[in-house]
Amino acid sequence: MKWLFWASPPQDDSNSNSGAASQVKCRNNENVDVPAPSNAAPPSDRTISKVQSSSRDWNSIVNATDWKQFTEPRTIIPTALVTGGILLCVHIHRKYLRRIPEAGHISPSFFRRRSLLGKVTSVGDGDNFRMYHTPGGKLGGWEWWRKVPTGKNELKNRTIHVRLAGVDAPELPHFGRPAQPFSQEAHSWLTNYILGRRVRAHLYRPDQYGRVVATVYVRRWLFFRQDVGLQMLKHGLATVYEAKTGVEFGGVELERQYREAEACAKKKGKGMWKALKGGTKGEWESPREYKTRMAAEEGQKKNARGITRKK
């Protein structure tokens, strides 16, 4: 009711809906839609800078880097020295300082080319023993930084079984076989000579018993090292190893020295040669003859058992 003076005048649609689009009449009486202004705030300078930085050309960054500094001798030489030093340390550790736990872990490339330094932990017989590999010796930290285990549980599966090359000592009782004369003397001598000492074993080959055949040296007096097998021959507590196959001396020169030492001990009647020098040739038996006789007797016993079972 327009005549009522208190009536409110009609509101402008453009003010009531500011977000809606408006129409403008052009001269040719055509209506053109004009988008309404946005209520969003204008972007800040920080937003603009982020957008600009994200769209930056990375090629320009690479080109802007001064790569000449990486080709200068003052950069290349130290880098090459550090890299080469690291690779050299890794090579030395893998080849010389890595500990070998057992004979089965020795690489075939070691045989006749390399030697192992270790500490003797036990002596099993007159011509074999076990040693704990200590690569590098004292320079590798052993004895003052790294300790060699002493307990049986600690040493289990962690020692190398070594067979002395070129010699054969009297047999101790084992596998049901009786002890051979002078076997205890040979075992006691070897125990006193090398047990608890550091030895160096020059490796030749593995044998059928899981041992490694080697010429072993021990330092008894200052810097003078002694061939353990050769010393046993000189004391008459072993013979030169005699077999049809598998004989290992480590060279013609060592074999010559071994045979001369055996002949000298035999002539002087030392150790096990006492019985032979005393004229009891029939009672004397070499370790090789003893093994052959024991094998023959065991074979006869097996054959006798087989015949008895058939009956």
Swiss-Prot record:
Presence of the UniProt keyword Calcium in the record: yes
Predominant location category: mitochondrion
Active site: R163, E171, R211
GO molecular-function terms, A-Z: endonuclease activity; metal ion binding
One Pfam family here: SNase
EC annotation from Swiss-Prot or TrEMBL: 3.1.-.-
Residue ranges with Polar residues bias: 11-31
Disordered: annotated segments: 1-53
Transmembrane segment boundaries: 76-92
Domain of life: Eukaryota
Membrane topology category: Single-pass membrane protein
Residues of the TNase-like domain: 114-275
GO CC annotation: membrane; mitochondrion
Annotated residues for binding of Ca(2+): D168
Subcellular location: Mitochondrion; Membrane
Keywords, comma-separated and alphabetical: Calcium, Endonuclease, Hydrolase, Membrane, Metal-binding, Mitochondrion, Nuclease, Transmembrane, Transmembrane helix
Family, per entry: Belongs to the LCL3 family.
PANTHER family attached to this UniProt entry: EBNA2 BINDING PROTEIN P100, SERINE_THREONINE-PROTEIN KINASE 31
Protein's UniProt name: Probable endonuclease LCL3
Organism: Coccidioides posadasii (strain C735) (Valley fever fungus)
Source species taxonomy: Eukaryota, Fungi, Dikarya, Ascomycota, Pezizomycotina
Gene designation: LCL3
